[in-house]
Regions:
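Acidic, low-complexity intrinsically disordered segments
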Residues: 37-87
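Short, flexible N-terminal segments of the mature chain
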Residues: 17-44
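Short, charged/polar N-terminal "headpieces" of proteins
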Residues: 1-18
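Generic structural hydrophobic/aromatic packing signal, biased to beta-strands
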Residues: 6-8, 22, 38, 80
C-alpha cells in the first residue's frame, strides 16, 4: 500500500515543538479530515499543544507502507509516526 505522508509540527504549551508524520492512504486527500486525525492524536497526549492548521501540517511525499502502518490505517484510517518531542 502506498501512503501519503503529512509532515506536522505542533507548538506545545511547554515551548517544545512536536514533530510527527500523519500517514493516510495515498488516494485520500481530505485535508480537514487529516487535520482531524492529527488533532485527535495530539489531544491523546498528557500535555497541552496547539491545534493543527494547514500551515503546520503539509503533504510531504508518498511512500510504500510497512505492515504496521497498514494495520493502523485498517483500524483507524490513519497512522502516526512520532519524530520529536511527542512524549
Amino acid at each position: 500500500m502506498n501512503v501519503s505522508v503529512w509532515d506536522t509540527y505542533v507548538q506545545r504549551k511547554d515551548g517544545k515543538i512536536m514533530h510527527f508524520d500523519i500517514l493516510v492512504p495515498s488516494q485520500f486527500n481530505d485535508e480537514q479530515r487529516i487535520l482531524d486525525f492529527g488533532n485527535s492524536y495530539v489531544s491523546s497526549k498528557t500535555f497541552e499543544a496547539s491545534k493543527l492548521t494547514t500551515e503546520i501540517c503539509n503533504f510531504c511525499h508518498i511512500e510504500s507502507a510497512p505492515e504496521s502502518v497498514i494495520d493502523d490505517i485498517s483500524k483507524n484510517g490513519y497512522s502516526i509516526i512520532e519524530m520529536e518531542n511527542c512524549n
